Design a protein with these regions (language model features):
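Short alpha-helix boundary/capping elements
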Residues: 43, 47, 93-96
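Enriched for short, Lys/Arg-rich terminal
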Residues: 74-136
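Arg/Lys-rich, positively charged N-terminal/basic patches that mediate binding to nucleic acids
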Residues: 1-43, 130-136
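A short, surface-exposed loop/turn module that caps and links secondary-structure elements
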Residues: 45-77
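A general secondary-structure signal for short beta-strands and their flanking turns/coil
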Residues: 4, 64-66, 84
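Residue-level signal for alpha-helical context at structural boundaries
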Residues: 33-37, 57, 106
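Alpha-helical interaction segments
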Residues: 9, 22, 60-61, 107-108, ...
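A generic structural signal for short, solvent-exposed coil/turn residues
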Residues: 1-3, 61, 92
Length: 136
């Protein structure tokens, strides 16, 4: 099911309009562009990173996987996990496409439960993807 190929990375317009915009406001354009390139690189080679603490698999089906990627903003001192920055990504393993559904800071969506909150957002905004994981 999994591939050793390179993934094509796509940022969903929803995350561009909402969460990326908020993160980009808090940091310089240079920091955000470097961070985005880093996220793209990691996702292009996600199979190497899924085995580390930078990413974790959340849901798996024949259609693909949903993963959570931990990342830090370029030029900051925190580790990827401690930075509280996350990306929720749908991996279509058959097409080798990594579709970034959400990029957020835990500060933005932490209450009352981060996981429940981002899952609800993904359920609401991406029902066509979540139907693929309906047995969860």
């Amino acid at each position: 099911m999994y591939t050793s190929g390179r993934y094509l990375v796509q940022f969903d317009p929803y995350t561009e309009r909402h969460y990326i915009k908020n993160i980009a406001k808090r940091h310089s354009d240079r920091q955000w562009q470097a961070t985005r390139k880093s996220i793209e690189f990691v996702l292009e080679h996600i199979e190497k990173h899924i085995l580390t603490d930078k990413a974790e698999t959340i849901h798996v089906s024949d259609a693909g996987r949903i993963i959570k990627l931990y990342f830090k903003i370029a030029g900051t001192k925190d580790s990827a996990k401690r930075s509280s920055n996350r990306a929720v990504v749908f991996l279509n393993d058959k097409l080798c496409v990594a579709r970034v559904l959400l990029i957020y800071s835990k500060e933005e969506i932490c209450d009352p439960n981060e996981t429940a909150r981002w899952q609800k957002i993904v359920d609401d905004q991406f029902p066509e993807i979540m139907r693929k994981f309906s047995s969860r």
